[in-house]
Amino acid sequence: MLLNGGGGQIITSPIIEREHRPFQLPPKNDRMSRLFSYLLLTRGIDKDVLYEFVRRKMIYESADYHNAVFVGYDTNGKPRHAHKRGTVTSNPYKGNVASSQPEFSFHWHGKSDRFYLFEAPIDMLSFISMHKENWKSHSYGASCSVSDRVLFQCLKDNPNIKNVYLCFDNDQAGQTANKRIAEKLNKMNIQNEILIPTHKDWNEDRQVAGANSPHKSAEALNLEESEVGTCQEL
């Protein structure tokens, strides 16, 4: 709304409506060789952990740019969120698919009373890889940001959760978010603890620990197509 000179006439600017794009998962590639190479060899994610998420159709390789796609589902099993991560290390692209709902970002529901919140899916997978014992029994979420929305949605959907572990990055943004969310949880009388990675993030901890040895190869990890299968078979 603008004033026209000194005459006082009000000129109303037209309202520009943004086109709503319905949420749609990126098309799947028929092979996942780049995905497995990136997550297993470059990022050091444990093979058994990764395969479990792939088997549940929570991770796949996109057909267009061969991104790793991390899918979040609602309680009815409908995809509501997808985070894309480039598999080319020289071009570290990352972003959420248009119209993704942040409260349903990449997460795992277990039956124990523990929930672990991370910034990125790869940090979540790295932490699980380092703490594999009974990992499926716990709950995890990756906000794909420093948001707390997936946490509070999981608290709503999973009444078993009584203890929350805040695991954001070891930097100013991550630790500021950890403290902000901890204050919210304290007001709700929900037990919580802040876990800080030794290095920048949990994937760096995983790699420094030796999981991403440069001597590893696809053969050492048994990455035959018959084992990893294709997206169409999953």
Q: Where is each model-derived feature located?
A:
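Generic non-transmembrane alpha-helix signal with a bias for helix starts/N-cap capping motifs
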Residues: 32-33, 120, 178
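Conserved aromatic-histidine-acidic binding/catalytic patches
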Residues: 27, 113-115, 169
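Phosphate-handling DNA/RNA-contact segment within nucleic-acid enzymes
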Residues: 63-157
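TOPRIM fold recognition
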Residues: 129-234
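Basic, glycine-enriched DNA-binding surface that flanks or lies within the catalytic cores of DNA
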Residues: 4, 8-102, 106
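Short glycine-/small-residue-rich flexible loop motifs, especially phosphate/cofactor-binding loops
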Residues: 36-37, 124, 182
